[in-house]
Design a protein with these regions (language model features):
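Terminal amphipathic alpha-helical/low-complexity segments used for targeting or macromolecular assembly
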Residues: 1-54, 167-172
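Conserved short-loop catalytic and cofactor-binding motifs
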Residues: 10, 27, 31, 59, ...
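Short linear capping/connector segments at secondary-structure termini
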Residues: 40, 59-60, 109
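Short, T/G/N/S-enriched strand-turn elements that build extracellular solenoid repeat scaffolds
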Residues: 45, 69-71
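Left-handed beta-helix
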Residues: 53, 58-59, 64-65, 72-73, ...
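Conserved catalytic-core motifs of eukaryotic protein kinase domains, centered on the activation segment
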Residues: 107-109, 113-115, 139, 173-174
Length: 174
């Protein structure tokens, strides 16, 4: 996956507008009765209508750059999720994301903190991310993969694999 960099010293107007838009939408979503027509409309708008049929996102949630998130069909995202999406986040069909999960597609350069390094995060079909797991930039969660609760995922997770720990390691193949 190709890394790209964002220079924070010269913020793009579009990125600044998107940042404000996401903060405001998350505030509205987190203060709206869940699973109502209004709530579902706000979630759809946060993700620029890139959310598939039958998908549910539970509050509270924090999303940075919602225009860089794509959510497939029948996805469940539980409470208190954090999506740092400058590098892009793709969640394919039938994925489950438990509570307190962090999907992070960007980080600060270790030598120059005013530069964001960005790599996309992808969760393939039927992947399951356990509570409190952190998925770092550039990671792909494999098809039918399981990430154990509390895992820190620093490397791609192969299809049909269970990983756990910090850093996450293969526990078994399924």
């Amino acid at each position: 996956m190709e890394e790209f960099r964002i220079e924070l010293r010269k913020p793009e107007e579009a990125a600044s507008i998107e940042g404000i838009r996401c903060v405001q939408f998350c505030f509205k979503i987190n203060h709206t009765m869940p699973m109502t027509e209004e709530y579902n409309r706000l979630v759809s708008e946060l993700f620029m209508r890139n959310i598939g049929e039958g998908s549910r996102v539970m509050p509270p949630l924090t999303v940075v750059r919602g225009n860089r998130v794509k959510i497939g069909r029948n996805v469940v995202v539980m409470n208190n999720s954090l999506f740092m999406a400058a590098g892009g986040i793709t969640i394919e069909d039938d994925v489950m994301v438990a509570a307190n999960v962090q999907l992070i597609s960007n980080n600060h350069d270790v030598y120059d903190h005013q530069i964001l390094t960005c790599k996309p995060v992808r969760l393939k079909r039927n992947c399951w991310i356990g509570a409190g797991a952190t998925i770092l930039p550039g990671i792909t969660g494999g098809e039918n993969a399981v990430v154990a609760a509390g895992a820190g995922v620093t490397k791609d997770v192969e299809d049909n694999t269970v990983v756990g720990g910090n850093p996450a390691k293969v526990i078994k193949r399924i």
